[in-house]
């Protein structure tokens, strides 16, 4: 059985870049775009790579900045300076 890991953000210009990075690094990810928020689902695992977000934003990015835009997450969280990973493990 596959469970989706997901993350939801407030909808704004910075999160547009973050979502683009997530979709690039998670080929199975699906985006649910709503008026005030954007949610990204990914089967089993969702990873946000600092380097990809920096590439999309055109500036340095600290993964702690995600907290400013974050609404909710689903999955076990594993975080380093370079990756923010949500997953469901059996």
What spans do the regions from the language model cover?
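A common structural junction motif
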Residues: 26-29, 61
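Helix-rich interaction surfaces within compact, conserved domain-sized segments
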Residues: 34-37, 41-90
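Conserved N-terminal glycine/acidic-rich loop preference
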Residues: 1-21, 25, 36-56
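Short, conserved, surface-exposed binding loops centered on an aromatic residue
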Residues: 21, 30-31
């Amino acid at each position: 059985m596959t469970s989706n890991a997901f993350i939801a953000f407030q909808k704004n210009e910075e999160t547009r870049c973050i979502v683009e990075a997530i979709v690039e690094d998670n080929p199975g990810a699906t985006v649910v775009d709503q008026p005030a928020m954007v949610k990204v689902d990914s089967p089993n695992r969702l990873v946000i790579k600092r380097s990809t977000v920096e590439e999309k934003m055109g500036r340095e990015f600290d993964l702690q900045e995600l907290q400013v835009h974050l609404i909710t997450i689903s999955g076990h969280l594993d975080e380093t300076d370079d990756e923010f990973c949500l997953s469901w493990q059996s």
